Amino acid sequence: MAAGELEGGKPLSGLLNALAQDTFHGYPGITEELLRSQLYPEVPPEEFRPFLAKMRGILKSIASADMDFNQLEAFLTAQTKKQGGITSDQAAVISKFWKSHKTKIRESLMNQSRWNSGLRGLSWRVDGKSQSRHSAQIHTPVAIIELELGKYGQESEFLCLEFDEVKVNQILKTLSEVEESISTLISQPN
């Protein structure tokens, strides 16, 4: 295979985007054959396979180390000097790709590494109670809190909580105690 066949910036940029979608964002259906036929149709499969593995390995190395731009430049320079490494044009495309996709890839990796549900959203409001078994409780303020919980790649679950004034005051007291404990721990000398 001629070196120029794997040099083009647009096909390499497309390949890196597809690898990121497959590896970090969980989009199925991105196959080696699809990538080769769409991006490098002139390259035989037996020559494309090692190139694909090399690019996937480089991308995984960069992402797993969460490289900043100085680390990235040093890493890519080392890759260009390595026997069977990458060309300086390929390094430039990889660098440009990482600069524009680092945040999304990092966020995706963080989401995938969480085992438990996380808080995706919170909304609250204060209403006046309009119905009650006891007429004295009608028109008293009620805090309604809605929590949106979920894991990466799954639909959210919603939890709706209702608190009267007494419960809100208890929660505020508990939060003040937690804040006090944290402040005490932080202000202690090592």
Swiss-Prot record:
InterPro entries from the UniProt entry: COMM, COMMD1_N, Murr1
Keyword line: Acetylation, Copper, Cytoplasm, Cytoplasmic vesicle, Endosome, Lipid-binding, Membrane, Metal-binding, Nucleus, Protein transport, Transcription, Transcription regulation, Transport, Ubl conjugation, Ubl conjugation pathway
Could you give a GO molecular-function term held by this entry?
Answer: copper ion binding
User: Can you quote a single GO CC term?
Assistant: cytosol
The family database entries (PROSITE patterns) matched by this protein are listed as: COMM
Q: Where does Cu cation bind?
A: 101, 110, 134
Q: Where is this region: Sufficient for interaction with SLC12A2?
A: 2-123
- Which Pfam families would you find in this protein's record? COMM_domain, COMMD1_N
Record-annotated COMM domain positions:
118-186
Q: What is the name of this protein?
A: COMM domain-containing protein 1
Q: Which organism is it from?
A: Homo sapiens
